A protein has these predicted regions:
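Patatin-like phospholipase
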Residues: 7-140, 146, 152, 185-195, ...
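Amphipathic alpha-helical segments that form well-ordered structural scaffolds
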Residues: 147-154, 192, 226, 333, ...
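Flexible glycine/proline-enriched surface loops and loop-helix/loop-strand junctions
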Residues: 131-136, 207-211, 314-320
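A short alpha-helix-loop-beta-strand transition element characteristic
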Residues: 157-169
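Short loop/turn motifs at secondary-structure junctions
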Residues: 26, 72, 240, 298-301
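C-terminal helical/tail subdomains of lipid-metabolizing enzymes
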Residues: 147, 282-360
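A general structural motif
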Residues: 26-27, 165-167, 239-242
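Conserved catalytic block of serine-dependent lipid acyl chemistry
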Residues: 2-6, 36, 170-294, 334
Length: 360
């Protein structure tokens, strides 16, 4: 399974992964990049939740539409940087833990109902107020806008990562060595996941052992490297596989369109080059790395889940929004695409459908 980058339309991937779980599909190897890393870990090593519940709850991190129309930023995911901001979040956490009727953490427990007695809109409004009051050390010398996923350890059980059944690979680009770095499940820590999600400008490069990394998906939106023969060893890191299933949410020309406003223009300035990178990567892999050098026959079958076919035509301008309605709609679209894919290729995938209702 190859899980590509992309956010906030990552709920398409979350929906498809939830469908795979419901259909009893298991993978021997998972290779992820960008936001796909988080989606893959939610499906294999979630903390304090079942994989399906964790994926479905990801669709709930969008901002209530009534607020998003006025302030189109996901302050629930993107937090202010700096030591003071971190102390503020910790202090607020301690206060909320002592308040009856409220869940443990409005900042860390991103996948729980933070205000148990409150509506979703009130919950999001409280998030906005607390985020607005948060201090920040952001200045002209900062290397990125946001804190590196402060909720990560409360979402992923990193002690379970080495024990997960499938092999798991993630990528990040090493700025000091000028090469892509691949880590396997025995190497992955929270720091490595933060490195794999450190998209330039949004986040400062992540430092690991004195070296600096940015998001691998900024350059390789699909992490095919584990399936490519290493010239030094003569074998691919992931070993021999006969079928690749690809979850790609960037290689779609309909993502390139006229922006609706200045903020949308900025978002699309990030996405536009990634569309062609994703398309080119898939063609390059199939033509150069997935061909028998003697016969020219494909080395393995490559199946792509058509995640975006079910997106309503009139909804495409909103596909990159962090609004609650968009993220929930895309989850439903991704789930249906995943189910259809499993029904079409069930025998090949070894699907064994479970009784698991769709809810998001």
């Amino acid at each position: 399974l190859v899980i590509g980058g992309g956010a906030p339309n990552s709920t398409l991937i979350a929906g498809a992964l939830a469908a795979f779980l419901a259909e009893g599909v298991e993978f021997d190897v998972i290779s992820a990049s960008g936001a796909g890393v988080l989606m893959g870990l939610l499906a294999t090593a979630p903390r304090d939740a079942s994989p399906q519940a964790a994926l479905m709850q990801w669709a709930e991190v969008g901002v209530a539409d009534s607020i998003y129309k006025l302030f189109p930023v996901n302050y629930k995911v993107f937090k202010k940087p700096g030591a003071q901001a971190e102390s503020y979040r910790d202090a607020m956490l301690n206060q909320f833990q002592q308040m009856p009727g409220l869940a443990a953490s409005p900042f860390a427990a991103m996948f729980s109902q933070q205000f148990a007695e409150a509506s979703a809109k009130w919950n999001d409004w409280m998030h906005l107020m607390m985020s607005a009051m948060s201090p920040s050390d952001l200045h002209s010398g900062s290397l990125g806008l946001c804190a590196h996923l402060p909720f990560l350890e409360q979402s992923i059980d990193f002690s379970a990562v080495p024990r997960m059944a499938p092999e798991f690979y993630i990528n990040a680009y090493n700025l000091d060595r000028h090469r892509m770095q691949i880590w396997n499940k025995d190497q992955i820590t929270a720091a490595h996941v933060r490195a794999s999600l450190s998209f330039p400008f949004l986040y400062a490069p992540t430092e690991i052992d004195g070296e600096h990394y940015i998001e691998g998906a900024a350059l390789d939106t699909l992490n095919f490297t584990p399936f490519i023969t290493d010239p030094d060893t003569g074998v691919a890191p992931a070993g021999e596989v006969d079928t690749l299933v690809v979850l790609d949410i960037l290689g779609e020309d309909r993502l390139i369109r006229k922006p609706r406003n200045l903020y949308d223009a900025w978002v699309r300035s990030i996405i536009t080059p990634l569309v062609k990178i994703s398309q080119t990567e898939q063609r390059l892999f199939e033509l150069e790395h997935n061909r028998d050098p003697v016969t020219g026959a494909p080395l393995r079958q490559v199946l792509k889940v058509d995640l975006m076919a079910g997106v309503p035509q009139d909804h495409w301008p909103q596909v990159l929004d962090w609004s609650a309605s968009n993220m929930q709609l895309l989850f439903q679209v991704g789930y249906r695409a995943g189910v259809d894919f499993c029904r079409q290729h069930g025998e090949l995938l070894g699907a064994d459908a479970q009784d698991a209702p769709l809810a998001a």
